[in-house]
Amino acid sequence: MTASGVPTAGRVTKEWAAEFPGFDAWKSLHLLRRIGPVVQGICLDRTTGDDGYLPTVHVHALTREFPVVSLMLGQRSARPSGMPDPVLFARHERDFAHAVGALREQSRLPLDELPSIDEIVRQYHAEARRRLEKGHGAAVPEMEDSVLVAAAAGRDELAGEGLVLARELSASWPKSSMPFDWPGSDAWLDGLAVRAGDRESLLSVVRGQAIAHKLGKIRDHLAPDGVRHDRLA
């Protein structure tokens, strides 16, 4: 607590971590938990004026080389109107319990229980479908992550489902929304299938990304053999 009575970012981080003991504090205002080849996060994203934070849940796949932990499948805490629902640091003590409850209720993935690889992958699938339905363009990263996370976790059948869905959706993606270096659907799907079929290379990328993002202190709740650790002590 500062002299003005406004809680520090460190205290806010600790209080959120206490509410969600399955997560670990990764950085200031950012909690993570690792589930094998993917991390699930609670990011207390600072507001533009730096006087508050916006609770945001997300996931990030470790199966792609990426310079930062992304906010994929991000869901910001929202009011009934759909507008963002930030928490001012000056009102944190008053609004904290409401913010925690709202995030729990709104998150599509469980926060108190450990989501399975299946649940996470199917949320990628659902997001890809939503993007197409709403006209938001191609969901290339979502579909790639869904396939590669499943493959890295040894869920070959689930990865296969993702490849089938990727073929179905990519046929309807508007050309104007495709990445500038798009090789074409067939070449993309063939390349994705090859990457999914090389689990050892995927696991090597996962290990490298865990080191690059300094995840050593973040517990991995999925054992190397794919068995989940349901007791989050």
Language model features by range: what are they?
Residues 5-9, 34-39, 49:
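Short, surface-exposed loop/strand segments
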Residues 6-27:
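Amphipathic alpha-helical segments
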Residues 25-36:
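A short acidic/basic microdomain associated with nuclease active sites
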Residues 38, 43-233:
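Intrinsically disordered, low-complexity regulatory regions enriched in serine/threonine/proline
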